[in-house]
Amino acid sequence: MARAVGIDLGTTNSVVAVLEGGDPVVVANSEGSRTTPSVVAFARNGEVLVGQPAKNQAVTNVDRTIRSVKRHMGTDWTVEIDGKNYTPQEISARTLQKLKRDAEAYLGEDITDAVITVPAYFNDAQRQATKEAGQIAGLNVLRIVNEPTAAALAYGLDKGEKEQTILVFDLGGGTFDVSLLEIGDGVVEVRATSGDNHLGGDDWDERIVTWLVDKFKASAGIDLTKDKMAMQRLREAAEKAKIELSSSQSTSINLPYITVDADKNPLFLDEQLTRAEFQKITQDLLDRTRKPFQSVIKDAGVSVSDIDHVVLVGGSTRMPAVTDLVKELTGGKEPNKGVNPDEVVAVGAALQAGVLKGEVKDVLLLDVTPLSLGIETKGGVMTKLIERNTTIPTKRSETFTTADDNQPSVQIQVYQGEREIASHNKLLGSFELTGIPPAPRGVPQIEVTFDIDANGIVHVTAKDKGTGKENTIKIQEGSGLSKEEIDRMIKDAEAHADEDKKRREEADVRNQAESLVYQTEKFVKEQREPAEGSEKVVSDETLSKVDEAISEAKKALEGTDIGAIKAAMEKLGEQSQALGQAIYEAAAAKAQADGAEGGAGSADSDVVDAEVVDEEKDSK
């Protein structure tokens, strides 16, 4: 049975994990790191770089490097590269493809099934887009799981049968979630969840960037925001400074040659940022985490003292100010230090993959929908059919009627959110139920059913009870991709995978050819210019043939025809072998001649053919 992986598709970093003998293992990527930057770059030569290689070249390729695309999931955002528009799903699929390849290299087998995590507060459009990204990457997405739920699963499964209440505080690179869960006897049940899909470590980085821009403008009189390359260097320096301030009281930000003045003289940026100053400029960001925390406690109907454990998830929770705030909010409770905040979500996803594949027994995961779902009714009111924090999968029906006499159809507009006025919420999609027989208003009976599957993806049906006519919508409008578009993107991704494979093979052939040319040139030089005391043993004719093959190989390497490089390499290999054989034959002939000479000169001497002395034996 093919194995399934768990993937934490993060805003700034992504992680893949797999079960080995029932235990989750985080898979290191091809660069040797356990986390992969969620960065995709389109190099000028047509190559697509993913992860650390993409991040490394960001400064010199700003316009063609895409990061933090998770913040655009479920929207109509696109980025244009070389005349082609890429959706967030396609960019995310590149990251997923790399994680898939790295996991396949580790396991030595193909992988198709995966559990992918999303922030608990992701709406339907964002979940649908994540699933589509998985499909484009060639993955069968078994389940979309909420990140805090996955973290609780990873944390709580080995904690015995005693029922416990766990608070998961998840502050990642681009999103924030807080969830309250109950774990006991193999059941992980989410009681309540809340969050902010536009709050994360990226925002803390951006504050440092703004602070540096203001400082530089005050000292040098130059606005760096107009220089894309300088801004990219500032972002990288800001991220580094933020990390350093988690363990130090101050950090030095030194960027030589950041820009030039009016006279083309190079200018340097050199600033000292203290932890106190950093906390001051980001205090409002920190305060934004309070409301979701209080909302979760209220929705779950518990008090802070009922919380048994606090689990921190996401690299941003390493900031001391975040840890201190969590302690304050939970009444002084010390957050659990036994989990790696960067890896725990992927570990939980791998466990859930094991549950779905039957490798992990006696575990039941009960997740919730993060936002209320409803339809727009007369007066633009949001009528909720499913309240937030309802355990999923779930199905709810309610009967509505017409607003006007002889109304032939009804427009069903599906919204997600907590506002009382429908238009203030997120419109997920709309569809029409037609063919309603003429009748006074209030007479037709229209049954609207909401069905949320285990991935948190919504299906809505409207049925006229009188005629039995019905219409169904699987909410997809939010992601903006039709099935045809997804299929096209899958084909594109497969084509790119073949292209990437071909590119790697081409690079291997080129490297082999260059190496063979270098080694053979060195060998020929040694034969032409023998060391002192040695003599030339190979004819000029043989060496000339090798020289000719070297020239052909060099010429082929100047071009891009891999077939020509292979042919030239084959010919050079043959000539190189012929050279080796000529050297061997010359050496053998010389040895024979020397032997004959030696034999004639010592015919009368006493020759001992072989005498073996065992010193150890003689000494006994």
UniProtKB/Swiss-Prot annotation:
Residues 606-620 have a biased composition (Acidic residues). GO terms for molecular function: ATP binding; ATP-dependent protein folding chaperone; unfolded protein binding. The modification Phosphothreonine is found at residue 175. Keywords: ATP-binding, Chaperone, Nucleotide-binding, Phosphoprotein, Stress response. Gene3D superfamilies: 1.20.1270.10, 3.30.30.30, 3.30.420.40, Actin, Chain A, domain 4 (3.90.640.10), Substrate Binding Domain Of DNAk, Chain A, domain 1 (2.60.34.10). Induction: By stress conditions e.g. heat shock. Residues 591-620 are annotated as: Disordered. Acts as a chaperone. Belongs to the heat shock protein 70 family. NCBIfam families: PRK00290.1 (NF001413), prok_dnaK (TIGR02350). This is Chaperone protein DnaK. It comes from Mycobacteroides abscessus (strain ATCC 19977 / DSM 44196 / CCUG 20993 / CIP 104536 / JCM 13569 / NCTC 13031 / TMC 1543 / L948).
